């Protein structure tokens, strides 16, 4: 049994130490994100047996953004299986910024990773659906199953993103021209933009991590969401590419599968044990929450979790 007092103390200490850390700035290329109060901060644990510990602004709802890629990858694995995902998308880090097209040019249009924009747009196109609305509803449903039924689209975030997503539209057409997109290019881009525009809070984000930690069973609803055999593929991708250009540094220092989003959220998974999540809007130059990284790393260190330890 995990010690409840120790878990709450770890969360409290991480929040106290890092919630007012200076550095970073909000994502400014999406108007909605630029206007989120920069002083917000939260950290939470949800264990694989369903216990919740949190500190700070843990009820504040923020844009899921790139963390949504984890959910869509999970659904693609359920729909088409791990071999098809590897063949059609790839399973390798790009070593490039999350919105780069260089990897597409270097690898014949294949996107390489489902956790960067090109691969995520292609992954969205893999979801079994007869039309854009069905594709979107299935992706929203998997987000809700993994994290909580209150996860929902923000029209304000979506509008803010749809009016500025020219780069992603270009990526979608590049994928389409190379034969690595499996539905209409603008449909894929539209649904991808919507999946990034849902709102979540820090406890729900930790619940997403706890569902992965529990082998695909949501510990709060006790419902199986994913096949257990698919979870290791998700965690492997998170370890390799979850924090963009900081992924190697994260693996070296923290040693947990992680995923960040430019909305300020960050998630880590301790397989079999818990999900750890944090939120704070100011980002480093790679697009990862400055305070969030520190808070999650602090919790993991205090509790002694690192997948590379014996």
From Swiss-Prot:
UniProt-listed SUPFAM superfamilies: beta-lactamase/transpeptidase-like
Quaternary data: Homotetramer.
Organism: Escherichia coli O157:H7
PANTHER family given in the database record: GLUTAMINASE, GLUTAMINASE 1
GO biological process, one term: glutamine catabolic process
Residues reported in the UniProt entry to bind substrate: 66, 117, 161, 168, 192, 244, 262
Keywords tagged on the record: Acetylation, Hydrolase
Protein name per UniProt: Glutaminase 1
Coiled coil: none
EC identifiers of the protein: 3.5.1.2
Family: Belongs to the glutaminase family.
GO MF, one annotated term: glutaminase activity
Modified residues (N6-acetyllysine): 294
Top EC category: hydrolase
Pfam families named in the record: Glutaminase
Reactions that this protein is recorded to catalyse: L-glutamine + H2O = L-glutamate + NH4(+)
């Amino acid at each position: 049994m995990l010690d409840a007092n120790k878990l709450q103390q770890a969360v409290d200490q991480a929040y106290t130490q890092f919630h007012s850390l200076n550095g970073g700035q909000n994502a400014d290329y999406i108007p909605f994100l630029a206007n989120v109060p920069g002083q917000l901060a939260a950290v939470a644990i949800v264990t694989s047996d369903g216990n919740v510990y949190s500190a700070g602004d843990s009820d504040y709802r923020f844009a899921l953004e790139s963390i949504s890629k984890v959910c869509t990858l999970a659904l693609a694995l359920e729909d088409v299986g791990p071999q098809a995902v590897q063949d059609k998308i790839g399973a390798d880090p790009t070593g490039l910024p999350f919105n780069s097209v260089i990897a597409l040019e270097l690898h014949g249009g294949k996107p390489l990773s489902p956790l960067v924009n090109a691969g995520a747009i292609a992954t969205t196109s893999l979801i079994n659906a007869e039309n854009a609305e069905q594709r979107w509803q299935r992706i929203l449903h998997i987000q809700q199953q993994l994290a909580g039924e209150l996860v929902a689209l923000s029209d304000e975030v979506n509008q803010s993103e749809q009016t500025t997503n020219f780069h992603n539209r270009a990526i979608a057409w590049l994928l389409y021209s190379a034969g690595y997109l499996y539905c209409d290019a603008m449909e894929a881009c539209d649904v991808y933009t919507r999946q990034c525009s849902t709102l979540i809070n820090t406890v729900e984000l930790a619940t997403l991590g706890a569902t992965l930690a529990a082998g695909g069973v949501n510990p709060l609803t006790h419902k199986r969401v994913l096949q257990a055999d698919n979870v290791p593929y998700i965690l492997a991708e998170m370890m390799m590419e979850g924090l963009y250009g900081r992924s190697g540094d994260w693996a070296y220092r923290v040693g947990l599968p992680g995923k960040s989003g430019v909305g300020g959220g960050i998630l880590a998974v301790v397989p079999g044990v818990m999900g750890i999540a944090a939120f704070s809007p100011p980002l480093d130059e790679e697009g990862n929450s400055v305070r969030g990284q520190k808070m999650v790393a602090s919790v993991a260190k205090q509790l002694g979790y690192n997948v590379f330890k014996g």
